[in-house]
C-alpha cells in the first residue's frame, strides 16, 4: 500500500480541529480499500485528509484559527464536503455523507459519520454531477434549467399577453 497522499489533499494543521470518524465508505456501492484516501474540503480548499484503514478511520477537519496558514478553513456551523481518492484508479470522486455534521465551536470535537458514498448521477455517471431539473431533464448545467410559466407550471407554455393576462398553456 502506498502512503503517498494526493497533492490535491494537502493541508495545514490548525489549532481548531474536529475528527469525523467514518464507519463505511463506498464507491458505487463497493467498499473502498485500505490505502484509498478520504479528504474533507471547504469549497476547493482541502482542510484535512486521512488514508483509509477501515471502519472508524478518523478524518481530521481543520478550522480557521486566525493564522494565515488556515485562512479559508472551516468556521463554526459550516459543513465540510468529502472526496475519496481511489488509488487503484488514480481518480478523485465527490463523496456524500450519510448525515451532514457542522464544524463545531471550540478547539476539538469528535463526530461519527455512518457512511460516505460516491454515487451514480441521473445520467449513470459514477461520481457525476448531473441532476434532474423540475422538468425531468438530466444534465449538469444549472443555467439551462426549465422555468415556471405564469400558470406556475414547470416548463409550461403559458405567457403574459399584450393585455397583461396569462394566456396559452393550461390557462
Where do the model's predicted regions map?
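Primarily marks secretory-pathway-exposed extracellular/lumenal segments that are disulfide-
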Residues: 1-171
